[in-house]
Amino acid sequence: MRWEEKDIITEAKKSGFKAIPIFTKDFYSAIGVGENYSELEADVIIQRNTSHARALTTSLIFEGWNYNVVNDATSLFKCGNKLYTLSLLAKHNIKTPRTIVTFSKDKAVDLAKKIGFPAVIKPIEGSWGRMVAKAVDEDILYSFLEYQEYTTSQFRQIYLVQEFVKKPNRDIRIFVMGDEAPVGIYRVNERNWKTNTALGARALPLKIDDELRDLALKVRDIMGGFFLGIDIFEDPERGYLVNEVNGVPEYKNTVRVNNFNVSSYLLNKLREWIKK
């Protein structure tokens, strides 16, 4: 278990909840066979699987057994697929980085010229900045696309290329819990253009203004889900751009720099939700 899962269990005990960890290696679904996890007594299942595929699958199974799951499988699918995320946000007039998606390497390079270089290539699914690369010209972009083609990803021949947003050396992560956006951080990296904390970015406290809060809650309405981490870029000309949405967000550094108890806040919001 990560720090977050341990903290949820600790805070649950303090709040009077009975927290029961469920490990994927022990989990099973026995359809038409007999005893299974569907007999577990629980008001809510908090989805904290580190694997997107396992998170999506276990949420689907628990929902099939009529459990309340946070987050539900539909919102996890929307968040886990970057193309789906961007398409939904664009449909609802939420500003995002300019993006192209093609099934041809040559077409991807040709369209990338309209976005301009440097350009960013990223996988349709993935986290922690893995397989995300910056191409400074056409030749390098083609090489990255060619490399992707020979990976084992199911989306290896779907090419997603984005503009390189000229943001400060930071991005923003806003946490939404239920109908509130109570806390966020700046993720700052002076040595790498990627601002994932998993890649060395520093977390700094963020004061959420009304514009950011309204934007985060609009994204929540579009994506669904109960507990989201929303990643936002600051563009010098276009303002806030929503880059990605995380359906199983990590928050250890957010707690540390803000002195804000995310686990306790989440559990209290879940208590309110269960009582409705």
From Swiss-Prot:
Short sequence motif named N-[TS] motif that is essential for LysX substrate specificity, residue ranges: 253-254
Keyword Ligase: yes
Cofactor detail note: Binds 2 magnesium ions per subunit.
GO biological process, one term: lysine biosynthetic process via aminoadipic acid
Pfam families in the record: RimK (PF08443)
Cofactor(s) in the UniProt record: Mg(2+)
Domain ATP-grasp: 86-271
GO molecular function: ATP binding; coenzyme F420-2 alpha-glutamyl ligase activity; metal ion binding
Assigned keywords, A-Z: Amino-acid biosynthesis, ATP-binding, Ligase, Lysine biosynthesis, Magnesium, Metal-binding, Nucleotide-binding
EC number: 6.3.2.43
Positions of Mg(2+) 2 binding: E244, N246
Disruption phenotype: Cells lacking this gene require lysine for growth.
Annotated positions binding ATP: 82, 122, 126-132, 162-173, 187, 196
Pathway assigned to this chain's UniProt record: Amino-acid biosynthesis; L-lysine biosynthesis via AAA pathway; L-lysine from L-alpha-aminoadipate (Thermus route): step 1/5
Catalytic activity: [amino-group carrier protein]-C-terminal-L-glutamate + L-2-aminoadipate + ATP = [amino-group carrier protein]-C-terminal-N-(1,4-dicarboxybutan-1-yl)-L-glutamine + ADP + phosphate + H(+)
Top enzyme category: ligase
Biological function: Catalyzes the ATP-dependent formation of a covalent bond between the amino group of alpha-aminoadipate (AAA) and the gamma-carboxyl group of the C-terminal glutamate residue in LysW.
Subunit-structure text: Homodimer.
Protein name: Alpha-aminoadipate--LysW ligase LysX
Record organism: Sulfolobus acidocaldarius (strain ATCC 33909 / DSM 639 / JCM 8929 / NBRC 15157 / NCIMB 11770)
